Amino acid sequence: MCIRDSTHIYPTNLKLQKNTINILLGSTLAGKTTLMQIMAGLDKPTSGEIWFNNENVTGMKVQKRNVSMVYQQFINYPNFTVYDNIASPLKITGVSSDETKQRVGKVAELLKLSGMLNKKPNELSGGQQQRTALARALVKDSDLILLDEPLANLDFKLREELREELPKLFENR
């Protein structure tokens, strides 16, 4: 698979099993983020195909793919509260307000955000903003969740906690 004639990603075949956690390792500039962007539909391969759940999704629009992604450089909606940032993918897909409240509460508790749900991103530390972006990806019932170094900006204690807690969250999916 080749992107923009500058990044080559090897091997060309990658198979991910449903309900598993897979880790993509590589050196800086090896193409890990590029591969995840291709899988999410945010970038297109110059050759090859992307298959997910036995379906060719290479040309599928981003909105049609049930994928969540968190970048190392997190992104939050600056005018939304933490609650609204986390709930945004649920609201877009028409999840009821009761279920939204329950799911946001669960992921907020896991990521130690419960006391911050009424705050805006500019009132949070960098680690709290990263956890908000992570919560937004985890709250949605995605077929594929792509995490690009999601724990990199967190303090040591929380990073270690989440290394243990994240797999538990996926066990219930």
What is each PLM-predicted segment?
Residues D43-K44, K91:
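A position-specific signal in ABC ATPase nucleotide-binding domains
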